Amino acid sequence: MKKALITGITGQDGSYLAEFLLEKGYQVHGIKRRSSSFNTSRIDHIYQDPHEVNPHFFLHYGDLTDTSNLIRLVKEIQPDEIYNLGAQSHVAVSFESPEYTADVDAMGTLRLLEAVRINGLEHKTRFYQASTSELYGLVQEIPQRETTPFYPRSPYAVAKMYAYWITVNYRESYGMYACNGILFNHESPRRGETFVTRKITRAIANIALGLEDCLYLGNMDSLRDWGHAKDYVRMQWMMLQQDQPEDFVIATGKQITVREFVRMSAKEAGIEIEFSGKGIDEIATISAISDEYATSAKVGDIIVRVDPRYFRPAEVETLLGDPSKAKEKLGWVPEITVEEMCAEMVAGDLQQAKQHALLKANGFDVSITLES
């Protein structure tokens, strides 16, 4: 039985990857950080009590900032595959906490690679590094492919660039099977609420049911290549099953604006909207309502505004990946469209919003946490 070690297992990608590997018959080990509150909601459904007979899923406390912990865990587990998905992954937060972002995202990758090397597992353990399309930043060509020069535009992207190149360096220096997946934006109902797609679908659901008045966004002209996390974790696994390690772009090859994702999300909730104004004065107004979900929304309501607080210090205007290498060499193609992904996300957030609305209607004090 193959053994896999996943950092970031409590996140969106980690939870989907754990499901995928368990279905493949793997023994899955995940590293989770100690928290004062429960942070395992995405993996509760696959959790196995260690007292059960022959469990295949194990959680370990650890942190990418703790060298000795990583060395010990790699020694104890002796993994066949490591998927380094753990990171401080929010671009805006990286401007507020640049040192922490560098420590986790850059040095954390080095610590994990060193844990493999120090334990003498260079030729046993295969290593996958979750890289990012943010490396391209101020894009040098469209679309972006494996050979496109990097131009990072945030502390997060700079940290991830170090992680990318140290992974390449360990592959070339020590003969490790180590590779980078350059992941373009990928979403799902498990996406964190502060990331723009989930922020949008959650707010639209809340607005439809009268739990929120208005959604505030930054640059709505931003173009992104959005795929589904399920498709992307499948590609991550495929990358470690090849004869030779290579780096791959993981993307759909299609892009839409943030504005269009808002429109798409609203339509899934039965709300038609019209945009007007420009720049910080742009708004979206409800023009029609066509679904029973939107019980509290009214035609004429302004439900989207621009807030300059959400502009990045250095903006990344467009990201569009070219996944042709993945298709040609691995046979990978994304199976879930952005429209299907959006519908799934809105449906999930509507279900949650309906529960909150029901509690509120029956006299319970329900507060909806909104991004500041």
UniProtKB/Swiss-Prot annotation:
Q: Which cofactor does it need?
A: NADP(+)
What stretches pass through the bilayer?
none
Q: What's its EC?
A: 4.2.1.47
Gene Ontology BP annotations: 'de novo' GDP-L-fucose biosynthetic process; O antigen biosynthetic process
| Record keyword Lyase present | yes
Which keywords describe this protein according to UniProt?
Answer: Lipopolysaccharide biosynthesis, Lyase, NADP
**Which GO molecular function annotation, any one, does this entry have?**
NADP+ binding
- Residues of the active site are 132, 134 (nucleophile), 156 (nucleophile)
Q: Kindly list the positions annotated as binding NADP(+).
A: 8-13, 63-64, 85-89, 100, 160, 186, 191
- CDD domains referenced in this protein's UniProt entry, alphabetically: GDP_MD_SDR_e
- Write out the catalysed reaction: GDP-alpha-D-mannose = GDP-4-dehydro-alpha-D-rhamnose + H2O
Q: Which domain of life is it from?
A: Bacteria
Q: Which InterPro entries match?
A: GDP_Man_deHydtase (IPR006368), NAD(P)-bd_dom (IPR016040), NAD(P)-bd_dom_sf (IPR036291)
Pathway this chain belongs to: Bacterial outer membrane biogenesis; LPS O-antigen biosynthesis; Nucleotide-sugar biosynthesis; GDP-L-fucose biosynthesis via de novo pathway; GDP-L-fucose from GDP-alpha-D-mannose: step 1/2
User: Family assignment?
Assistant: Belongs to the NAD(P)-dependent epimerase/dehydratase family. GDP-mannose 4,6-dehydratase subfamily.
Family annotation (HAMAP family): GDP_Man_dehydratase
Record's function text: Catalyzes the conversion of GDP-D-mannose to GDP-4-dehydro-6-deoxy-D-mannose.
Write down what this protein is called.
GDP-mannose 4,6-dehydratase
- Organism equals Yersinia enterocolitica serotype O:8 / biotype 1B (strain NCTC 13174 / 8081)
Name the gene behind this protein.
gmd
